[in-house]
Amino acid sequence: MFLLLVLLTGLGGMHADLNPHKTFLQTTIPEKISSSDAKTDPEHNVVYMITIEGKPYFVHLKKQSILSSASFIHSYDKNDIRHSKPLLVQMDCNYNGYVAGIPNSLVTLSVCSGLRGTMQLKNISYGIEPMEAVSGFIHKIYEEKFADTNILLEENDTYSWFNSEYQVRKSSEKTDFIKLFPRYIEMHIVVDKNLFDYMGSDINAVTQKVIQIIGLVNTMLTQLQLTVIISSIEIWSNKNKISTTGHAEYVLLEFFEWKKDHLNFKPHQIAYLFVYRKLPTLIGATFPGQVCNKDFAAAVALYPEGLSLESYTVIIVQLLGLNLGLTYDKTDTCHCSGDVCTMTPKAVYSGGVKDFSVCSLDDFKYISSHNGLTCLQTNPLEMPTYTQRRICGNGLLEGGEECDCGNKDNCTHKLCCDALTCRLKDNAQCGSGDCCSKDCKFKPANTICRKSVDVECDFTEFCNGSYPYCLLDTYVRDGEYCDSGGAFCFQGRCRTFDKQCDDLIGRGSRGAPIFCYDEINTRGDKFGNCGTEYCLFQHILCGKLVCTWEHKDLISRPNLSVIYAHVRDQTCVSTYLPSRKPPPVASTVSKTSYYSVDDRDETFVQDGSVCGPDMYCFKMRCKHVRFLMDFETCEASIECSGHGICNNFNHCHCEKGYNPPHCKPKKEAFGSTDDGHLVPAEKSYMEEGRHAPFQKQRFQLIFYISLPVLIITTAILIKRKKLRELCYRGETESESSVSQESSSNSKSSLSESTSL
């Protein structure tokens, strides 16, 4: 596995010379004008006339997909508690396009609350943003200027990873016949604390800048027909979760470990860490050619002081290109339509349009045609469904609205939201939604906003304390067992035949045996069918709902026709709604009076019902449950540590006492990262998962080291005491002996003296 470091030398010069100056040019009032495209599809197409230095530029824009309905922003308060909310308000804001009459021009703009973004012409870039303190849709125009500099990428270090083993294709291999088609990749973006502070320490402002960066990334990737969808933005607004100092490769390896524990990854997703460095020697690090390896799909992009958003975007595009398997261009053989090619060092500090070279395009075509990008989606998942127009007063929060409390007469939060403009009133935190109180404040975190409707298959959702709406519905992943293994969870309900029959005709009616289904659903009429025709035997449990009836009196539910069949001592019943309209003329040959397999009502078996061992019904067909569940993304025994179950987002929903995302033990924790329930985050998941065992091992180590030392010390003290007693006893005996000897000598002398 190669680790690629994008090395930028001479950054002392960059600090002084490469700092791009925003040269203010003028103020202007963009004018929205009509066009044939805008008239045909005004929701997706718009045209503005923007005058710069007396010259009108006609900017044609098309709606750009950057966010999905599942995109979230995560941030941390001063207590390091994480707060999450969807990015729904930003979904309809992003556009890209071109300037009419200027070949190869590129424009990337956000159109909510004014125009904000970049216009890239041949060799010059203009920025535009609203003057928020001034009324009247006045905007300021500035030019991005880069001073000449001799800063280059250090070739030996930068290209050290690129050898014969990693060669994308042979130069003789032609790719002219290969056609590209749209692909999508989801990106988790993490912003470190230093960059958060550098960008103004404001959650909304930093979020807007990140979205602006990815919008420009997508504009530059248009040649490759590749679109980046923001899966989540996590801003470390309180403190960094890993160390972001030191060499970029070490930061990448730390981020690599962090993402394994904290991000729920899918094969088509990638994680990027945005880091601020005042004067770095490296601008990034990544694993080349590993975009489809979810274990290594990550990169670190460093943001030097003074760098423009456009230049930083180029760094990210280059890193992403390396992730995809592209290489830096050899300037003597690789050429592009513009003055600067994207995969060259010069692109970082050049204004205007940057194109991918012929070499990069050929490499990308080759990789995509040789199954190198099979993980990338060919259709965007959960992309926004656009309506023909936004409607203020329909009670739905749509793009550009700050609130929507309903119409003027039925507004749910009259003190908080202007029902005519869908704007918040003064001092209001919120103006609509289940998590917005009547006094215009967010309801406290962990307030229930949507109760579970099925004890086995549905989960309760909570307000997160920072968003006015209840989060998306969460429930047990389709295909998980319920009813003691006799049924499957599907769309948040336990799909048992008994409950379906009781709901339809009541009085304890139960699901019928298979021979009742065989008798009725092979008829091919309005009481027994699989849509437009009779059911084949393998699908008979997936057509009309057949129940048993144990009462002597007839079923008397209004507007319900009933057929009775006596089979093997069982009274089998099937029903039909006579209020149904007859089929169109083209379908009169059908005896069932149903138009298609999708033309169903409550008299049919529900999708998700059991139709055999590990088999479930879907659109009147019996299918194997393995096609319903993605065990590669979420396997409860592994991802959830055996203390949770996978939800409809393929994330773990943890038991009480276990903390998401991987269900590690933690007091009072439960739920998932999707249901809004918050747990104080003083101790991170890594601290619980790694430091706790380490602490235990440390105490064990201290104990096992201390015990022998204590025993030895005690033994020494005891020995020393005995030795001291022995010495004392010896000294006493010695003194006594000397005394006796002295006395004896005295007596002897005295005797001798007397004798003389």
Swiss-Prot record:
A Pfam family recorded for this sequence: ADAM_CR
Keyword Signal: yes
Membrane-topology annotation of the record: Single-pass type I membrane protein
UniProt xrefs under PROSITE patterns: ADAM_MEPRO (PS50215), DISINTEGRIN_1 (PS00427), DISINTEGRIN_2 (PS50214), EGF_2 (PS01186), EGF_3 (PS50026)
Biological process according to GO: binding of sperm to zona pellucida; cell adhesion; male gonad development; proteolysis
Low complexity: compositionally biased ranges: 735-756
Broad class of the protein's primary localization: membrane
Post-translational modifications: Subject to proteolytic processing during epididymal transit of spermatozoa.
Residue stretches making up the Disintegrin domain: 389-478
One GO cellular component term: plasma membrane
Signal sequence coordinates: 1-16
Entry keywords, A to Z: Disulfide bond, EGF-like domain, Glycoprotein, Membrane, Signal, Transmembrane, Transmembrane helix
Purpose: This is a non catalytic metalloprotease-like protein. May play a role in sperm-egg fusion.
Protein name (record): Disintegrin and metalloproteinase domain-containing protein 5
Protein species of origin: Macaca fascicularis (Crab-eating macaque)
Gene that this sequence comes from: ADAM5
